Amino acid sequence: MSYVSKKMPKGVTPLYFIQAFSTFSFAILYSSLSLYITQQLGFSNTISNNIVGVFLAFNYVLHLWGGVLGGRYLSNRLLFFITNIMQGAGILVLILPGHSMLYFGLSLFLVGCGLNTTCYNSILTQRFKPEDEEQRDKAFFLSYAAMNVGFFSGYILSGFYDYSNEYQELFCISIATSLITAFILLFYWSCFEDNHTPLKAVTKSISRKKRELAGIVSTAVLVPLMIVCFHFSHLSNAVVVVLSSIMLLVILFLGKRQKDKADFQKIKAFLILTITSILFWMIYYTGPMGITLFIKNNVDKHFLGYEIATQWIMNINAVVIIIGAPIVSMIINRLKAKGVNLSISMQFVWAFLILAVSFLFLSIGVEFADSQGFSSLSWIILHLITQSVAELLIGPVGYAMIGKISPTNLQGILMGTWMMVSGVSASLSHYFSNAMVKTEAADPIVTNNDFLHVFNQLAIWALVGAIFLYFISGRVKNLIDNEEEIKTEEITV
């Protein structure tokens, strides 16, 4: 860690700790929400999938609004602080018993974590100059690992409550991590100042205060809007898709207005990779919905005579990423040093291929289920390991890509949009998850066919994504590297 501290700009290392602690409470809900809703509150599997789908979808849609607010109406560090408090307040509301406070608590929490994620990534991105590619890539891989330390801790703790189905005490513990996050942020406040943002250009005190007031009010208004969205989940999912489509068109328009043609070329590459990433995350986000229920009800979770909690099994993802992130970063940097330049688009191709393999493991597990319909735990472990490797080749790479190709004035919007399209994926993935649970039965013999059908479909879709990206990877690389423009200029000369 000291090596990283010497090489990285001031403030980067504290950001890793902020990432880990702020992720903890999200990990609690990410791993336990569907179980909390069905086991403790008594909702059906379909309603649970709808709620979790809205939760995931709007978490990512709010990333876009975080990109708009941060650096324009509120500084990224101030917005992060406010939303971190909201995140903790949402957990506090969920501690209250009964169904009536569920949507209010989830809405408070959702606005908090939805907005502050983009703030965090913007703060980290702004620690580097555009030409600091190697340092920036390494920082985002390590940040991704730190995030998964939070997931790992949340999953471990959640597992202790998997059988009791009493989650109030678990929620109390997660409030403490929000307080720790706030303390670290305040202690290193001066290290997280915005660089080259529109708000920094506002010199008049009155104009700045008006912007800040507008930012605070618009943040507060989001809470009742989220409550409405939870009550009308099907309409909400359609809204997510429409908003994302509009935003992609807006970015295309903004790209055409760029004075530098090279910036427009890079924005076109960004849009291509963003649209294809929707398919990847749509497949990936069946995890916290359908696959969690599959592991809970259709897998023999015994290991060495002990039954392992569902959340602990899901924790394999976090462990692989914590260990794998620095290793993958090191491998990519060594390949670059040897002249082997693995382009962003080709990393995406490998991500899709490995994701397809991960779902084939689940299908094989169902095909070789025992006489009672239970799949072997080994196939689940293989699925989670390969899925995690696929995530490493698209998650941190995408964040680092923004710092490389984005014009300074569009950095927050592009970062928010990149994260927002995951909301479209979550909206679509809940349909696959519902296809897995057409019946409320928990008997594996009854439900295995539904799961097998969907697993095969997801593997095929991932393979299609890999093939499509492979054939356009050269075009995308040229857009990012601006090779076509250089060739055109040479011909003109």
Which stretches of residues belong to each language-model region?
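Intracellular loop-helix junctions on the cytosolic face of multi-pass helical membrane proteins
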Residues: 1-10, 131, 162-292, 297-302, ...
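Central cavity-lining transmembrane alpha-helices of secondary-active solute carriers
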Residues: 52-70, 315-328
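C-terminal ends and interior cores of transmembrane alpha-helices
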Residues: 85-103, 350-372
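Glycine-rich segments within core transmembrane alpha-helices of 12-TM secondary carriers
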Residues: 135-156, 162, 177-181, 218, ...
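Conserved MFS/SLC helix-loop-helix module at the cytosolic interface between two early adjacent transmembrane helices
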Residues: 63-98
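Cytoplasmic membrane-interface "Motif A"-like loop-to-helix N-cap segments
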Residues: 72-84, 334-353
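Short amphipathic helix-loop junctions that connect adjacent transmembrane helices
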Residues: 29-47, 287-312
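Intracellular juxtamembrane helix-capping segments at the cytosolic ends
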Residues: 115-130, 392-406
